[in-house]
Amino acid sequence: MDWNWRILFLVVATTGAHSQVQLVQSWAEVRKSGASVKVSCSFSGFTITSYGIHWVQQSPGQGLEWMGWINPGNGSPSYAKKFQGRFTMTRDMSTTTAYTDLSSLTSEDMAVYYYAR
């Protein structure tokens, strides 16, 4: 029997306590093993050139694992070794949105993905 893994991506936005900051994440995503997924987080109330944009993964029953961040000054991403090669972070200054693309999905990618500043 051929099993197709379906991978759930749920992006949750987190930030420090600040009443003016708003974050809107993309909906949960379901993808087959081997596919790719792009998730997003739109934000307002702060400038993306003043704060780093971090992505964090939490697999079922596991702790938080830092995936990488986008440098606020030059927009360059930096990745944790585990995620290098399959994971791409970008930001769109015009829409104040951060994106992450994850390719060649496996069952190990089933997790909740957090955005943090």
UniProtKB/Swiss-Prot annotation:
Ig-like domain residues: 20-117
Keyword presence, Nucleotide-binding: no
Positions of region (Complementarity-determining-2): 70-77
Cellular component annotations (GO), alphabetically ordered: extracellular region; immunoglobulin complex; plasma membrane
InterPro entries: Ig-like_dom_sf, Ig-like_fold, Ig_V-set, IgHV
Region of interest: Framework-2: 53-69
Residues making up the signal peptide according to the UniProt record: 1-19
Location in or out of the cell: Secreted; Cell membrane
Region (Framework-3): 78-115
GO process annotations (BP): immunoglobulin mediated immune response
GO function terms (MF aspect): antigen binding
Glycosylation sites: N74
Pfam family name, one: V-set
Region listing for Framework-1, in residue ranges: 20-44
Segments for region (Complementarity-determining-3): 116-117
Stretches for region Complementarity-determining-1: 45-52
Role this protein plays: Probable non-functional open reading frame (ORF) of V region of the variable domain of immunoglobulin heavy chains. Non-functional ORF generally cannot participate in the synthesis of a productive immunoglobulin chain due to altered V-(D)-J or switch recombination and/or splicing site (at mRNA level) and/or conserved amino acid change (protein level). Immunoglobulins, also known as antibodies, are membrane-bound or secreted glycoproteins produced by B lymphocytes.
Subunit architecture: Most probably, the immunoglobulin is not assembled due to incorrect folding of heavy chain. Immunoglobulins are composed of two identical heavy chains and two identical light chains; disulfide-linked.
Protein's UniProt name: Probable non-functional immunoglobulin heavy variable 1-38-4
Species this protein is from: Homo sapiens
